[in-house]
Design a protein with these regions (language model features):
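Acidic, gly/ser/pro-rich intrinsically disordered tails
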Residues: 1-10, 154-172
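Short glycine-rich beta-strand segments
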Residues: 80-86, 129-133, 151
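Beta-strand/loop nucleic-acid-binding surfaces
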Residues: 79-111
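OB-fold/S1-family single-stranded nucleic acid-binding modules
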Residues: 129, 136-156
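OB-fold ssDNA-binding interfaces and closely related basic DNA-contact patches used
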Residues: 1-90
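Residues that cap or initiate secondary-structure elements
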Residues: 47-49, 134, 154
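Exposed beta-sheet edge/beta-hairpin loop segments within beta-rich domains
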Residues: 98-124, 131-142
Length: 172
């Protein structure tokens, strides 16, 4: 994984997006979001020095402690997925979210991004824009996705057998 900064944005290449309760692209109600509507995901920061530098820069990097002996603690960052309201702001920049599979690419929008909740994401490239949520302390940043290219491994063993069919149930 490689993390760099361009114009205040984080560029993350080869990220590991955490599965299960660490992602909620659909915005469904859950333990931490009982009313629903909040979309998010978390990715691992595999270099402790990079994680510390991000913390120093104001990013809200968390540490997941080891639960059992032999487990390794890891650092991660929560990233919000907020689609723009074009009625309120017609000049807003749309999000670029795409799911790359062996048979091509699917662009995802507000209605389809939930497909990533259950997908086996092997890696992702992410552009994250900061939002300074504390006006008194502009170093405190929340992370919002601007671009997400998720590389997905299909789970259906026979899916490639049906690529030639026009109405392929495995091609979204």
């Amino acid at each position: 994984m490689n993390i760099s900064t361009i114009d205040g944005r984080l560029i993350v290449e080869g990220a590991q997006i955490l599965p299960g309760t660490f992602r909620n692209f659909s915005g469904a109600p859950d333990q931490f979001n009982p009313g629903g509507g909040k979309r998010y995901f978390h990715f691992v920061i595999d270099d402790p020095e990079v994680a510390q530098q991000m913390r120093n820069d104001g990013w809200n990097v968390k540490i997941k402690p080891a639960r059992e002996e032999g487990d390794i603690p890891f650092c991660y960052l929560k990233v919000a997925v907020a689609f723009p309201n074009f009625q309120k702001n017609p000049k807003a920049r749309p999000l670029d979210i795409a799911m790359f599979k062996s048979n091509g690419v699917n662009r995802l929008d507000e209605t389809t991004v939930g497909l990533l909740d259950g997908a086996y994401i092997t890696q992702a490239n992410i552009t994250i824009r900061p939002y300074c949520w504390d006006q008194a302390d502009p170093s405190k940043k929340a992370a919002y996705v601007q671009e997400l290219h998720a590389f997905v491994q299909e789970s259906a063993h026979f899916a490639s057998d049906y690529d030639e069919f026009e109405e392929n149930p495995f091609n979204d």
